[in-house]
Design a protein with these regions (language model features):
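N-terminal "domain-start" segment that seeds a small globular fold
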Residues: 28-59
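Typically the conserved alpha-helix immediately C-terminal to a functionally engaged Cys/Sec
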Residues: 81-96
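Thioredoxin-like thiol-disulfide oxidoreductase module
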Residues: 90, 101-141, 151, 159-162
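N-terminal secretory signal peptides that target proteins for export/translocation
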Residues: 1-8
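Short active-site neighborhood of thiol/selenol oxidoreductases, capturing the structured segment around
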Residues: 63-78
């Protein structure tokens, strides 16, 4: 018995439907990468394991009105340089906690705007990323540094602005990679002393 053309069409339609469903259900690996300028999502959640950094708790205007030492970090979510700096920003939050106001600011909304004065984040941004600005309790600029700023330089500026002692040197801690995406800081074991 020869199958009718309608049966062949139904059979092929079923096979193609199952094939299409199978392809759509196939798991696709993550495409996030530290080494490209592609948007992967919130860089602090993805690359530093710390999604609590954004959005910031206070605006710059509120932090200045409360006379809080403020750390502004300008970044872009789709910048490899900002992605690599995310672990440093997370470590600064861990060390300084509630002693300072940490305000990470994505720079896209700042572009093409007019500077509205010292309470406006645009006032301090120089058009580079990342950029770190430490403001003292009276709003004075203690540090304004572009690029991948050494964490010890930022610690020194925050210590000066807050009057709190410096945290342990980064030579006692080092940046490590937990996996292909997340970086973090971990204590370095002291070197064994040799006896002569």
């Amino acid at each position: 018995m020869i199958p009718s053309p309608v049966r062949w069409i139904r059979t092929w339609a079923l096979v193609l439907t199952l094939l299409l469903v199978g392809l759509l259900a196939w798991p696709v690996g993550a495409w996030a990468s530290l080494d490209n300028d592609r948007y992967d999502g919130n860089i602090y959640a993805l690359y530093a394991g710390n999604g609590s950094l954004v959005p910031p708790r206070l605006t710059l205007a509120d932090a200045l009105a409360d006379h809080r030492v403020t750390l502004l970090v300008y970044y872009l979510d789709d910048s490899a340089v900002s992605k690599r700096f995310a672990g440093v920003v997370s470590e600064l939050q861990r060390v300084w906690g509630n002693s300072i106001e940490l305000i990470p600011l994505v720079t896209d909304p700042l572009q093409g705007r007019v500077d509205a004065g010292p309470s406006d984040p645009l006032h301090y941004w120089r058009g580079v990323i990342p950029q770190v600005v430490v403001l003292g309790p009276e709003g004075q600029v203690v540090l304004d540094a572009p690029g991948q700023v050494e964490i010890d330089i930022i610690h020194a500026a925050l210590s000066k602005a807050t009057g709190l002692p410096l945290p342990p040197s980064s030579s006692e801690r080092r940046m490590t990679s937990f996996n292909e995406l997340n970086d973090g800081w971990q204590a370095v074991a002291p070197a064994a002393s040799s006896r002569e």
